[in-house]
Regions:
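Catalytic centers of hydrolytic enzymes
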Residues: 1-238, 244-253
Length: 255
């Protein structure tokens, strides 16, 4: 689904549109390998795409719980939608050899699967059974509600101009596919000046319209080494020397 907060004065009640639940902030200590599995689970939000098909294909997997789709900021990565999902919606391993997460990088370099990261999320994710999360080496719940953190940020900044930093995308091997998704009909007013999305027409769902995703080739891709490294490195392993290093910080957006 979507939320539509108009430009102009922002009321505290608008925070409920951005964050529905009374979760508290949590901190996880995980490895690069665990982060990859975390993202493999999140990739279940998207359907598998047949790049050779000329028929319209739906981008969003409607059976996947949208609040389980996480974006991990501080990293860059891509999803290969031609691959099947590795996990089902419950987190059960269904395709052991599948790998949708590509070009996973930290600070512009392929991620070290044994490196330790601190990830900020919420208590719902931290205490759940998510692949890559359930075996975290350390979990801490902080005395701070996520909604209050957003409110504090807005009050501190006075004026905010939120925008996506584009740290994730799709592997451009589906450039000829007709990929569709639904959103607000009002969203077409924001399509000017961009060429990644086009308006198709009204949807059969009340309050929605249908859009087409346009995937294009991009230059300067990070070399994808995550699959090779995962094959030679046991998932979740770390040496004593690696645990002594200061853990890099990443943040995660989880509903």
């Amino acid at each position: 689904y979507y939320t539509d907060i108009p430009a102009g004065p922002l009321a505290i009640k608008n925070v409920a549109d951005l964050y529905l639940y009374d979760n508290v902030t949590a901190l996880l200590k995980v490895t690069g390998a665990q982060i990859k599995e975390w993202l493999e689970m999140s990739a279940g939000q998207f359907n598998q795409i047949d790049p050779k098909s000329k028929e319209p294909q739906q981008l969003i997997n409607s059976s996947y719980r949208s609040y389980n789709y996480d974006v991990i900021d501080g990293l860059t990565y891509k999803f290969d939608l031609t691959q099947p999902n590795k996990y089902d919606r419950e987190g059960k391993l269904v395709n052991p050899d599948a790998s949708r997460v590509r070009d996973l990088a930290y600070q512009g370099k392929p991620i070290d699967l044994n490196q330790t990261f601190l990830v900020v999320t919420n208590n719902y994710r931290a205490t759940g059974n998510f692949p890559g999360v359930k075996d975290a080496a350390e979990k801490r719940l902080l005395n701070l509600e996520n909604r209050q953190a957003i409110i504090d940020y807005i009050v501190s900044e006075k004026t905010i101009n939120p925008s996506a930093d584009g740290n994730w995308s799709f592997v451009p091997n589906i450039t000829n596919a007709d990929i569709r998704f639904a959103s607000s009909d009002n969203a077409r007013a924001h399509l000017a000046g961009q060429d990644a999305i086009s308006y198709v027409g009204p949807s059969t769902q009340a309050g929605f319209a249908e859009y087409r995703l346009i995937v294009k080739e991009k230059a300067n891709q990070v070399e994808d080494t995550t699959k090779k490294e995962s094959e030679k490195s046991p998932k979740g392993s770390e040496t004593a020397d690696q645990t002594k290093r200061e853990a890099p910080k990443a943040t995660v957006g989880a509903s």
